Amino acid sequence: MYVHVLFVWQFECRAIIMLDMTKTAAQDLAEFLGDDEFGTVLADPPWRFVNRTGKVAPEHKRLARYPTMELEDICALPVAEHLADRAHCYLWVPNALLPEGLAVLQAWGFEYKSNIIWHKIRKDGGSDGRGVGFYFRNVTEILLFGTRGKNVRTEAPGRRQVNMIQSRKREHSRKPDEQYRIIEGCSWGPYLELFGRGIREGWTVWGNQADADYKPDWKTYSYNSGLAAE
């Protein structure tokens, strides 16, 4: 099930919510976006891991955080059809799925250029070693950066921006809000967020958690080191 939430920011915030359990994600997104085009896309897809039953997996039977998508279905999302001639993409990908992330960038019409690393830290500033991983204990996630078109260098702030975010974790899989300040300073709009949680002024947000009243509801929420969205 996908929830359409379209927000128009003028003097107030208005939401249009439509539910349809029969459509594919690609069909749903195409109808939601209509004829709109965007200069910057931010996406945090629900990646499917080989181990879908582990305790940290999104589809863990007891915790059941959220459904995931096959790589081919993520690639099939009609992102390229809704891009301006000059566009940027910021794509979150787990360390173990870097090749898949690069494949999605290409499928959406972008060329990989660089990345931003999110370093998850504790209260005292040290690495939050509660992450998982088969080979190493992961304390980072990757935000891939890709471009489309000509004359697509980042805006002036980007040339001073280091490619690292250091912040504490919040609920499972939620990404740091620091990303928005970086993206809005380095890239131009209109802005589109795919698989977003909650809403943000000045952005078009699509996803089944793109709701003004979004609150995490899984049990692991209370164990994470940071606070939820205010």
Regions found by a protein language model. Give the residues of each.
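Class I S-adenosyl-L-methionine-dependent methyltransferase catalytic core
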Residues: Y2-E230
